[in-house]
């Protein structure tokens, strides 16, 4: 840290990705906890569940039947948050009347996908090897490539992709969209409605708030300094090492300086990668290795099925050449657990009304996660 005194005093830290601040209160880690505790997650699941709408061969809510897939499978969400077919909503926003100023709305079209990680109902990414995770990353890449606007400079890169042939082809959209958000909610504590290992990909005609804020900040930084914000940040973290959890030749996992969640991590490529389609075959495998390392260490930390929300931020599907070039691929992991398998962090009170706050410092979290290397804890129990 810049000054060891920050280990003991309350202070604020700046997040250059979102142009925001958070309060850090390391002295509060000693306070007793008498609040809510989460129930321990169920850990015994069958390899196949005849009632699960994600297992191979089963029927889904809308009546469609899943194929007997062997690796990954993607389909349009039966309960999509956005739709491809709906009336256009056009409103004149140029008027200065109060309704136009204060009651603004914007129509959003899109399509939401569900993508399974494995045909097995009882595994998570932490249980899978990097080679087992790789087909999911390949499928993410196909899905992203299929949705790129023809005018996007990345379309030419996507056309040269050589991905392994898959029995389950990635869906193709009916329209061009602005952004694709790939994310996973793992565990009931994060609102996951089905324990079968899966993620989602939502494509929208508008730019969502979080990646939009990051793209604005990355553009400003590059304009001011002539370099990429995250490239400079990686250089700094690799030199200092105190927040580096793990790394391989292509990726580094850090507990970011500005982390809000207790054991939040950021997965970053060591070279400028704009989007999934920029990754080489070896880099996709090394990304799978990074994801496996993060999720295994999470589970080992409190010896539980560690809940989290994770997501990929990358270049838009449709954007100017400059906007695409400003983008820097990265993956966020936001886990809620704080002290044990049953005590989680709540974003309430001061954090809702004022600004984000954390107790354990990212440097302390890094030390804890580094120590969670090794075999997955539950494999030692069997």
UniProtKB/Swiss-Prot annotation:
PROSITE patterns: GAL_P_UDP_TRANSF_I (PS00117). Pathway: Carbohydrate metabolism; galactose metabolism. It catalyses: alpha-D-galactose 1-phosphate + UDP-alpha-D-glucose = alpha-D-glucose 1-phosphate + UDP-alpha-D-galactose. UDP-alpha-D-glucose binds at residues 61, 77-78, 185, 200, 345-348, 350-351. One of its GO terms (cellular component) is cytoplasm. GO terms for biological process: galactose catabolic process via UDP-galactose, Leloir pathway. InterPro entries: GalP_UDPtransf1, GalP_UDPtransf1_His-AS, GalP_Utransf_C, GalP_Utransf_N, HIT-like_sf. It comes from the Eukaryota. Zn(2+) binds at residues 52, 55, 121, 196. One of its GO terms (molecular function) is UDP-glucose:hexose-1-phosphate uridylyltransferase activity. The active site is at 198 (tele-ump-histidine intermediate). Keywords: Carbohydrate metabolism, Galactose metabolism, Iron, Metal-binding, Nucleotidyltransferase, Transferase, Zinc. Fe cation binds at residues 214, 313, 330, 332. Essential for growth on galactose but not for cellulase induction. Belongs to the galactose-1-phosphate uridylyltransferase type 1 family. Homodimer. This is Galactose-1-phosphate uridylyltransferase. The lineage of its organism: Eukaryota, Fungi, Dikarya, Ascomycota, Pezizomycotina. The gene is gal7.
